[in-house]
Swiss-Prot record:
Signal peptide: 1-24
Residues with PTM Omega-N-methylated arginine: R167
Lumenal-side positions: 25-181
SMART domains found in the cross-reference section: EMP24_GP25L
Residue ranges that the UniProt entry lists as topological domain Cytoplasmic: 203-214
Domain GOLD: 34-149
Role summary: Involved in vesicular protein trafficking. Mainly functions in the early secretory pathway. Thought to act as cargo receptor at the lumenal side for incorporation of secretory cargo molecules into transport vesicles and to be involved in vesicle coat formation at the cytoplasmic side.
Broad class of the protein's primary localization: endoplasmic reticulum
Source species: Arabidopsis thaliana (Mouse-ear cress)
Protein name in UniProt: Transmembrane emp24 domain-containing protein p24delta9
Length: 214
């Protein structure tokens, strides 16, 4: 009973975090076009990706038109993976910087234009680890395996919460700075308006005095 409860808890937590750290996509790309996919990754997180151009005719080799170039970069412009004129490939690295990482695909230019179908699987954190490779020989080892996976999942959730808190603080600081600038701009606008109104008043007063209206 305990083992079933533990397994259920593990699965629920694992599914909860999987939606945030895993992308399995299928998309289309025309010849000569570029499409980018982003993933928000925190520093020191392991990330792996695998991409494949779908062969329209599996009985024959892929045509030359079904080639792509890919470049994976961080928000700071650092390149973590680059490949030219390939049908498939994979990448794996540990993120040094926190932020949005971009995987940009470019289909080779071809006339007439063709449409490529691409399968892309991008996993980060717990999902990047191949848990299926762990051998299980007895009930004790099964429980140990589940506990390890649960610990990894909880740690990943904990790190994700701290990361989101840091991003929230950054946004709050940005909002405070923006509000402060807007306040100073409002005061400056008010000062300019009062100055212009004062100059208009002096000008009109002088004008009417010369005309002996007042």
């Amino acid at each position: 009973m305990f083992l079933r409860s533990l397994n259920l808890c593990t699965i629920l937590l694992f599914l909860a975090i999987s939606s945030q750290v895993s992308q399995s996509l299928h998309f289309e790309l025309q010849s000569g076009r570029t499409k980018c996919i982003s993933e928000d990754i925190k520093s020191n997180s392991m990330t792996v990706g695998k991409y494949t151009v779908v062969n329209p005719n599996e009985a024959h080799p892929s045509p030359q038109s079904h080639k792509i170039s890919i470049r994976v970069t961080s928000s700071y412009g650092n390149t973590y993976h680059h490949a030219e004129d390939v049908e498939s490939g994979q990448f794996a690295f540990t993120a040094v910087e926190s932020g949005d990482y971009m995987a940009c695909y470019t289909a080779v230019d071809h006339k007439p234009e063709v449409t490529l179908s691409i399968d892309f699987d991008w996993r980060t954190g717990v999902q990047s680890k191949s848990w299926s490779s762990v051998a299980k020989k007895s009930q004790v080892e099964v429980m140990e395996f589940d506990v390890k996976r649960l610990i990894e999942t909880v740690n990943s959730i904990h790190e994700e919460m701290f990361y989101l808190r840091e991003r929230e603080e950054e946004m709050q600081n940005l909002n405070r700075a923006t509000n402060s600038k807007m306040a100073w701009l409002s005061f400056l606008s008010l000062f300019v308006c009062l100055g212009v109104a004062g100059m208009q008043f002096v000008h009109l007063k002088t004008f009417f005095e010369k005309k002996k209206v007042i």
